[in-house]
């Protein structure tokens, strides 16, 4: 509650005094001065205030500017002023205002949103009139806001750690907040189907950052820094104690970006940043009851670095790039103005921009259409001969969720020459089908077989050249397109999609692919073979090993329940061994055997005397399972990836080295496979493998104390850990071969050298 005022010495290098401003403002997350008045975004007070602070440190003229109802977690965050506007950015705990405010976003955008409408958003107030606007929405918990000199607001949006490890997880990101845009996020629960936040109708990020806890963002060309840092956008990351410098370059009507580490400390739990009167950067740390400090960051010299001499061609390219961006930016501003006035006008120029190669122009054109009455432009979309214009225009129509449009959209959708589309158009084309399904499933059902065949024909592996394994567009990658295709095919009960999902998703090395495949086919009852059913439930059985956030086990439990309900009685009998198998079955197979001998390498010298071991490789594969090797190691498509992949181990090790590695696993252990020793403050020592969790911000640490038993997992409080160090001991137990005879060991080595 209240505020602190720090007065600096004339040198600006030391705090002279600290005063408590006793005012009833709870948790002020945003502060900005305007005309000698302080504007304060008091999160727990759920109100934006205006006040003055006199020389005696007393608050005066405290005025409520506007209340913002809702919760307080992802709440009322940062403030900034630019061009006569006060910008306020809020998280998804705050209710989106709908009274006494001009909403610049699309009126149909919530039609395509499943479930909750809770979303982070950017508001702005004209300081001269007090008029409020909803500038854009679809954020999660953006803490900071900064406006570039050209007028584009930027933020650093948080991820939803609950979704980590899933194909619908969205990492932290830098977002250019364009007028009327929707970044796509909505608060969602742990129910299926999940919400895939990034869709073609949403604004794409400028840059994905990854693991971090975003706090403030900052840019100020008046910083006494050399270029390029004077023009950089700075991101504050609380968790990793760092400040990133993002260098932005115009790309058409939007931006491209590259980030570098600017500053890092231990600790440096950065919360906010500002420019001081000396041009230096002032950074404050603290938060969540941690020590708070104020730092001054100054350049040794503000002189610009001497740029390398550019060739004539490079200079021409740079000049052309700037001119092109200015042209595209003018188009975007024209569209944004049309979107604001909402008056009847000649729409052909807007229609033309729907097919622009620039994603920001296409987005602005579609928003401009959506803000006009549909009757003014529905006919233009249906009559256009340009497939790209039709795609993006129909995306606007489909979001309105009017069932009368579904039949017309679907008829042309089936006639589209998708092979001629680029990746962005394929995402839009697929999204149209999904929206038609959501609006009126009965219309799509009448054309089910045609729709399924059309979708399967564009599965990436079947249409694109084999040499193309990954394409990237602002809408996503081919990997994500395949995942989305699987979801739509699953909704259509497409039996013929099972082999595609089995080959490309179930068998993928990507965890997200596996989950996407399991999610898509969880209700599918027909079209399975025993092999694909086994593959499905083997993956479900291994889901405890998946790395992710708190929500991942809950999602997987729900997928498993739905999948079990889809099994027939005959299928349950056919794969009973997989359904009934315990997670410790491999370990129990070893424990059930009697001791043969405590083998040493010298005892088995005759097996390893030749470079190629002759043995029964099929029986070796059986020994591989019985010795629990697959419990930690992958062999082809079988086993788990806890330890090194053994698929090609015969190319790396000769027979003697192979045998020694099995008999004495701690003889040489790579650092990433060592056990960890965790000493608690109580004196207890836990030795095991620390399970990598997607939610790295969890207060607990999970340790698997027995590498052969999945259920041997304990949780310890990170705050109670006294010391942590790596052990020289391998997680692979000694004596794994002591229950096998000489011939069985020979067969195992033969199998490892050359798998069946």
Q: Which residues are covered by each model-predicted region?
A:
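Beta-propeller domains with acidic blade repeats across secreted/periplasmic ectodomains
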Residues: 1-337, 636-637, 717-719, 727, ...
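Gly/Gly-Pro-rich "capping" loops immediately C-terminal to redox-active cysteine motifs
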Residues: 20, 639-663, 675-726
């Amino acid at each position: 509650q209240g505020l602190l005022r720090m007065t600096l010495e004339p040198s600006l290098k030391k705090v002279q005094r600290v005063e408590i401003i006793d005012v009833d403002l709870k948790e002020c997350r945003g502060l900005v001065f305007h005309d000698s008045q302080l504007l304060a975004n008091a999160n727990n007070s759920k109100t934006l205030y205006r006040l003055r602070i006199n020389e005696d440190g007393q608050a005066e003229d405290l005025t409520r500017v506007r209340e913002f109802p809702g919760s307080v977690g992802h709440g009322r965050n940062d403030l900034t002023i630019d061009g006569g506007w006060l910008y306020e950015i809020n998280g998804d705990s705050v209710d989106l205002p709908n009274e006494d405010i001009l909403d610049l976003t699309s009126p149909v955008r919530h039609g395509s949103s499943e479930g909750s409408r809770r979303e982070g958003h950017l508001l702005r107030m004209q300081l001269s009139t007090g008029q409020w606007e909803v500038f854009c929405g679809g954020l999660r918990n953006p803490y900071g806001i900064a406006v570039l000199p050209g007028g584009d607001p930027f933020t650093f949006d948080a991820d939803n750690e609950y979704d980590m490890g899933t194909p619908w997880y969205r990492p932290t990101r830098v977002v250019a907040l364009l007028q009327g845009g929707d970044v796509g996020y909505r608060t969602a629960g742990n129910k299926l189907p999940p919400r895939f936040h990034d869709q073609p109708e949403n604004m794409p990020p400028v840059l994905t950052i990854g693991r971090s806890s975003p706090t403030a963002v900052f840019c100020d060309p008046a910083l006494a820094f050399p270029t390029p840092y004077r023009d950089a956008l700075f991101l504050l990351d609380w968790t990793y104690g760092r400040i990133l410098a993002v260098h932005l370059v115009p790309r058409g009507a939007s931006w491209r970006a590259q980030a570098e580490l600017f500053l890092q400390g231990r600790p440096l739990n950065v919360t906010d940043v500002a420019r001081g009167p000396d041009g230096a950067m002032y950074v404050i740390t603290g938060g969540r009851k941690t020590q708070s400090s104020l730092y001054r960051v100054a350049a040794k010299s503000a002189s610009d670095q001497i740029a390398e001499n550019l060739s004539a061609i490079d200079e021409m390219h740079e000049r052309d790039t700037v001119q092109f961006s200015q042209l595209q930016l003018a188009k975007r501003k024209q569209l944004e103005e049309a979107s604001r006035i909402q008056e009847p006008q000649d729409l052909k120029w807007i229609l033309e921009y729907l097919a622009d190669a620039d994603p920001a122009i296409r987005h602005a054109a579609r928003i401009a259409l959506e803000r006009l009455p549909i009757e003014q432009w529905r006919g233009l979309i249906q009559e256009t001969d340009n497939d790209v214009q039709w795609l993006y225009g129909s995306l606007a129509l489909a979001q309105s969720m009017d069932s009368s449009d579904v039949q017309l959209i679907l008829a042309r959708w089936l006639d589209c020459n998708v092979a001629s589309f680029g990746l962005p158009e394929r995402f839009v084309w697929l999204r149209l089908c999904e929206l038609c399904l959501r609006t009126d499933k009965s219309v799509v059902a009448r054309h089910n077989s045609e729709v399924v065949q059309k979708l399967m024909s564009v599965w990436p592996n079947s249409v694109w050249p084999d040499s193309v394994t990954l394409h990237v567009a602002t809408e996503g990658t081919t990997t994500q397109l395949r995942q989305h295709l699987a979801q739509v095919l699953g909704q259509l009960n497409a039996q013929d999609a099972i082999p595609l999902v089995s080959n490309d998703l179930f068998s993928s090395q990507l965890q997200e692919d596996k989950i996407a495949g399991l999610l898509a086919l969880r209700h599918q009852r027909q079209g399975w073979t025993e092999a694909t059913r086994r593959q499905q439930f083997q993956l479900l059985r291994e889901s405890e090993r998946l790395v992710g956030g708190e929500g991942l086990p809950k999602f997987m439990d729900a997928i498993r329940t739905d999948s079990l309900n889809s099994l027939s009685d005959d299928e349950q009998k056919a794969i009973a061994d997989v359904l009934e198998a315990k997670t410790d079955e491999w370990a129990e197979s070893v424990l059930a055997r009697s001791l043969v001998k405590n083998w040493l390498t010298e005892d088995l010298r005759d097996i390893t005397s030749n470079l190629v071991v002759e043995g029964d490789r099929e029986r070796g594969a059986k020994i591989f399972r019985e010795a629990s090797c697959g419990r930690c190691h992958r062999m082809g498509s079988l086993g788990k990836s806890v330890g090194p992949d053994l698929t090609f181990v015969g190319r790396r090790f000769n027979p003697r080295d192979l045998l020694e590695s099995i008999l004495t696993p701690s003889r040489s252990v790579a650092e990433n496979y060592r056990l960890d020793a965790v000493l608690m403050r109580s004196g207890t020592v836990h030795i095991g493998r620390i399970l990598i969790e997607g939610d790295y911000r969890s207060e607990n640490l999970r340790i698997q104390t027995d590498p052969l038993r999945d259920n041997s997992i304990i949780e310890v409080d990170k705050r109670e850990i006294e010391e942590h160090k790596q052990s020289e001991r391998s997680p692979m137990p000694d004596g794994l071969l002591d229950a096998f005879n000489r011939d069985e060991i020979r067969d195992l080595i033969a199998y490892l050298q050359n798998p069946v």
